[in-house]
Amino acid sequence: MELDLSPTHLSSSPEDVCPTPATPPETPPPPDNPPPGDVKRSQPLPIPSSRKLREEEFQATSLPSIPNPFPELCSPPSQKPILGGSSGARGLLPRDSSRLCVVKVYSEDGACRSVEVAAGATARHVCEMLVQRAHALSDESWGLVESHPYLALERGLEDHEFVVEVQEAWPVGGDSRFIFRKNFAKYELFKSPPHTLFPEKMVSSCLDAQTGISHEDLIQNFLNAGSFPEIQGFLQLRGSGRGSGRKLWKRFFCFLRRSGLYYSTKGTSKDPRHLQYVADVNESNVYVVTQGRKLYGMPTDFGFCVKPNKLRNGHKGLHIFCSEDEQSRTCWLAAFRLFKYGVQLYKNYQQAQSRHLRLSYLGSPPLRSVSDNTLVAMDFSGHAGRVIDNPREALSAAMEEAQAWRKKTNHRLSLPTTCSGSSLSAAIHRTQPWFHGRISREESQRLIGQQGLVDGVFLVRESQRNPQGFVLSLCHLQKVKHYLILPSEDEGCLYFSMDEGQTRFTDLLQLVEFHQLNRGILPCLLRHCCARVAL
């Protein structure tokens, strides 16, 4: 917890914060007490307790005024410490953290649920409460999203933010709301490869320009207050056209530093004379623009907005930017969060990891999280297992494993009729959270984008072009790709395949489980299920 010790927020003397005992004004001082300046410290003199208190009072008043950083430790029990300034600006608890408030939370299907929480409840506490009520699997990816539909702005709340404090800053009678959904990209900046989130061309330093810096050192530079990294790149800024009243987009070279966000009025110049100040990182929040083309006339779909905290409603005062692609927008958003929250963001990540490990130790079924680098193809046909290095041989082994799964499933589901269980097998996918029914291609991309463009986020939907087919929508390299799943019939049994029948599965559940362990024809494993949870 960080405390703001500036004199503007606290009293200027120790007596104002923590009153020291003194002699009452109606009680005269003892006559045998000489002034402190006449006391000869080398002579042993009896010192009464009242005189000792007066000497301490004199010494305390003669010292320089130092604010007391912990007024609540010396205040009377009945008197609460008075702290100046906004509690949210300094990261302190609200004055009455036990006060109960009602917060409305929406799910992705539009359902609303009112939750009674304490004024000091953080976003992580509210998410844990909602996970328990929805009987969902608890993990670090759950989060609350602050949504402003009228402005087409959304941002994910950090785990340490106070939900009630954010809600009280909304305009009265507006359409602002909290949405409960998964956000797999929340802590991806601590997990991703070095240059996935921070390309070399966008990262520079005011001290030296080092190339080939490791991911750990790069993140440490953002968290270290003594370093001066910055993000730079071209952005299109929304402004007014002269005399026309229309909003025009103009391309500028922008810089994001600890001191704020700037753009250069003269090419790529970093001269202070050419830098135009835009916003303060600590006094603003960054949002993703959801309907940029429709509402703001953006030239691309990769827009974000810097909204000052003092701005409550209306479009006036919003700083809206448009980047060239998703990677550059993700870089700007991640850097803004690191500059704003610093070490607190990493503490949130560590706490989320510790909670996940604790739940796993207590027996909760953890999510299987594996990467491509930790899985290898093995051959156990001989007396001892060996690692398969040949890619073609590894693909053949994966196909044999899929065929073994198919035979095992057929034997398990076999009844007096050979394929009498095919109807049950063909409908089992409808009970899975990753199946979204008949939604469009654009809707699937929107759902995956809302829950984080992280490698391995996927869902399965019905194909709109092929009445009997399905589509696997998968995110890879911050792009959503779609793979057609077609049914085929062999010996009276129904199978599903994505590679023209070379690898066949008896149902979609078997197909998904196989590709959670084996890439097959996919660019990455199926890691995160894009699911909707009803509150």
UniProtKB/Swiss-Prot annotation:
Phosphoserine modification, residue list: 364
CDD domains: PH_APBB1IP, RA_GRB7, SH2_Grb7
Sections of the chain in a coiled coil: none
GO cellular component entries: cell projection; cytoplasmic stress granule; cytosol; focal adhesion; plasma membrane
Compositional bias ranges of the Pro residues kind: 21-37
Pfam family, one: RA_2
InterPro entries per record: BPS-dom (IPR015042), GRB/APBB1IP (IPR039664), GRB7_RA (IPR046986), Grb7_SH2 (IPR035032), PH-like_dom_sf (IPR011993), PH_APBB1IP (IPR039665), PH_domain (IPR001849), RA_dom (IPR000159)
PTM notes: Phosphorylated on serine and threonine residues in response to activation of receptor kinases. Phosphorylated on tyrosine residues by TEK/TIE2. Phosphorylated on tyrosine residues by PTK2/FAK1, and possibly also other kinases. Phosphorylation is enhanced by activation of receptor kinases. Tyrosine phosphorylation is essential for activation of down-stream protein kinases. Phosphorylated on tyrosine residues in response to NTN1 signaling. Phosphorylation promotes stress granule disassembly during recovery after cellular stress.
Domain SH2 residues, every copy: 434-530
Membrane topology (UniProt): Peripheral membrane protein
Residues spanning the signal sequence: none
Domain PH, first and last residues per copy: 228-341
GO MF term (any one): RNA binding
Domain Ras-associating: from-to ranges: 99-185
SUPFAM superfamilies: PH domain-like (SSF50729), SH2 domain (SSF55550), Ubiquitin-like (SSF54236)
In-chain residues carrying the UniProt-annotated modification Phosphotyrosine: 187, 341
Chain spans, region Disordered: 1-90
Membrane keyword on record: yes
Record GO biological process: negative regulation of translation; positive regulation of cell migration; signal transduction; stress granule assembly
Keywords linked to the UniProt accession: Cell junction, Cell membrane, Cell projection, Cytoplasm, Lipid-binding, Membrane, Phosphoprotein, Repressor, RNA-binding, SH2 domain
Annotated family: Belongs to the GRB7/10/14 family.
Quaternary data: Homodimer. Interacts (via SH2 domain) with EGFR, ERBB2, ERBB3 (when phosphorylated), ERBB4 (when phosphorylated), EPHB1, INSR, FGFR1, PDGFRA (tyrosine phosphorylated) and PDGFRB (tyrosine phosphorylated). Interacts with SHC1. Interacts with RND1. Interacts (when tyrosine phosphorylated) with FHL2 and HAX1. Interacts (via SH2 domain) with RET and PTK2/FAK1. Interacts (when not phosphorylated) with ELAVL1. In stressed cells, but not in normal cells, part of a complex that contains at least GRB7, PTK2/FAK1, STAU1, ELAVL1 and TIA1. Interacts (via SH2 domain) with KIT (phosphorylated).
Function summary: Adapter protein that interacts with the cytoplasmic domain of numerous receptor kinases and modulates down-stream signaling. Promotes activation of down-stream protein kinases, including STAT3, AKT1, MAPK1 and/or MAPK3. Promotes activation of HRAS. Plays a role in signal transduction in response to EGF. Plays a role in the regulation of cell proliferation and cell migration. Plays a role in the assembly and stability of RNA stress granules. Binds to the 5'UTR of target mRNA molecules and represses translation of target mRNA species, when not phosphorylated.
Domain notes: The PH domain mediates interaction with membranes containing phosphoinositides.
Protein name per Swiss-Prot or TrEMBL: Growth factor receptor-bound protein 7
Top-level taxonomy: Eukaryota, Metazoa, Chordata, Craniata, Vertebrata
Gene that this polypeptide is encoded by: Grb7
